[in-house]
Structures are given as structure tokens and as C-alpha cells.
Amino acid sequence: MKTFQRYMSESVGQAGLDYELKVHKAMLAAKIPGLNPGDKPGAGFSNVGAGDIEASYNGKPFNIEIKATSNDQMGGTAFRYDYATKVFTPVKEMDPEDLNLLMAAAKEKSKDIDNYIKAARKLEPVQYHKTISGIPLKVSKEGRDKLKKDGFLAKINKNVKTSERFIVRHYNKKGVYYINVGKAGLFYMGKNPLKLPVPSLKGEIQIEMRLGYSGGKHSFPTDPITPARTAGLRVQGRLRTKSKSDYSLDNIEDIKKLFGIEK
């Protein structure tokens, strides 16, 4: 049986793919001379390429990031964290672009996570806590409550907001200069190499990080036994923008007007 969280994650992923297909279909149907929408978007993630749609116009790259809404989730998953190397590793596959962006922002929380682990290592019974090497981690139930009371958990469970400069730099590195957002339209990011009559994207990405304990009951083999709980780390990104464009690539008539086929 699927968990509700997994169901929602899969539903969001399907909604994103459906919107990519809608944009690709509209770009094909518009029949703009010189506009090649590229390959049809498909399920699964690729570590190569640039943008959700790799189009071209008159032989020039027209790589486009596609987001279904202006409050779109940018992927999310549970992460392992290694205290020694400071490396975050996703427990499941996700879009490489979104993954890189999430991890870049998540690194801002490394110090707070390290402080949590350092404090956890000093909890009683020390012989079982001192070997904590990262996340997931296991601590005594009493220790979990103490870490929360002392403010270590709250410092991790805070949203991190990134500026539009962060977004621009992230996508421009991959040769992506355009983003189409459902119900908001087409924007350029940083540069506008095709000189399209669209505005610059104004927005931010909010990274939501949560260290959460499971409901499962565990223990340490002391005498008497010490009740314990395990915790995992989840990171979720969300695009937030109030920008509006006069053109959207999900609309055939907009595409024709954008490229001067119709006035």
C-alpha cells in the first residue's frame, strides 16, 4: 500500500510531466518556421541535457525549464547526511537539476545539522550515542526531547529562501535561459539570447528542510532498556514567483504572437 506522502509525490511528478507534454504539444502545433521543440518529454530523469524541453530556434539553443505552477514543487526526497564528508545523498532518484539546486541550498544548514549531531553524541547512554555518524540517526527518546527543548531541532527545521540570482546562476550554468511557468507564462533568466519579448523572472526558491522522527519504537540494550527513536532528513524545494508574462508556451496563439506569426 502506498503512503499518502508517496502518493502525493508521485502525483506532483505526474502533473509536472503532463504540463511539459502540454507545452511540447503546443510548440509543435504552432508550426513556427525555424522552431524545433526537440524530443518529447518522458518519464524518468536524465543526467545529461539542459532544461525540461531542449528546443531550438533558427539553429540557436532554446532550452526551457518547465514548472506547472508559480508555487511549484521542485522535487523532494529523504536525504542521508554524512557528518565526516558533509555530503547529502538522496535516497531515491530525482531530477538532477532540482537535486543539485536543493543540495546547494541545503548545505547552508550543514552547520546546524553538525551541531545537532555533536549534541546527540553526548547524550546518555553515551556508549550508544557517541558513534552517530550522520543522518539517519538513532537517539534515546529522552534525548530526542532534550535536543528539541535546547533548540537544536528548530535551527534545522527552518525554511531557506534563495534569491532569483541563485536561480539564474543555477540554470545558466546548464545553458538554460528560459522558464515557462503554468498560469504565469514565459520568462528569461539572466540573459535573453533569443531577444524574445518576455520579462525577466522575479522570484525565489524556498527550501523546506525537516528532521523528523518516526513513530516506530526502538531501544538501546541497557539495563533496563532505554527507549529510542530514529530520525530522517527530508528536503523539499518550492518555486515561488508572482511574475506575469504576456506569453505562455502552453498556448498556441501565444506562441504564434511571440514569434511574430500573428499580431
Label every model-predicted segment.
Residues 1-10, 255:
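Intrinsically disordered, compositionally biased, charge-dense segments
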Residues 6, 25, 29, 257:
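Charged/polar, solvent-exposed surface patches and flexible loops
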Residues 7-25, 42-48:
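A short, highly charged nucleic-acid-interacting micro-segment common to nuclease
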Residues 11-12, 29, 35, 65-229, ...:
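Catalytic cores of nucleic-acid endonucleases
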Residues 45-47, 52-72, 244-245, 255-257:
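Active-site beta-strand-loop-beta-strand hairpin of nuclease catalytic cores
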Residues 234-263:
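Charge-dense, extended regions
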